[in-house]
Amino acid sequence: MQAHLSLLLACAAAFAPVQHMNRSPALFAETAEDPALAAAIDAAVALCAKEGAPAAAEGDRRLDFAGTADAETVRTNFVELIETVGDADAALRIVTNNKMVAGWKPDRVKASFDAWVERCETREEALDLVSKNPGLLFCKPADVKDSPAGSVLQAKMIAGAMDFFRFGK
């Protein structure tokens, strides 16, 4: 029951209205050697960071529920998201579909992603699933692992519908 509730909450969060806030185009210049990686990081910061947001404490890199995060928190968490999913474009797609992912604790995101990889047939399938519904990265890893057999199919159908009906796509 708890696993189904986690999945439903993740889906509901994805349909929450988008809040448009004043955002600076790029709050800092990235020094990554790969220009594509630097562009992805700058895009994530421009999309997710809020100028003037309080800096997160070192042990608590996450967004509050209002969705505000400083540029350094977004940058650090986004780089760790790239390492988790293994692809800068996929990571950018994830934060584009749910900006809050850029502020969630990276170890929690990794544990949840790994749980979805374990439940899906392939890593690519899990990546496609969480790219379409990034709220699934907020599910407790234990709930993902212990969910009933049909829950992955349900999650895929919901993610597909969310992707189909995504506003501004």
In which residue ranges do the predicted regions lie?
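Long amphipathic alpha-helical repeat/alpha-solenoid cores
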Residues: 27-169
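N-terminal chloroplast transit peptides
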Residues: 1-22
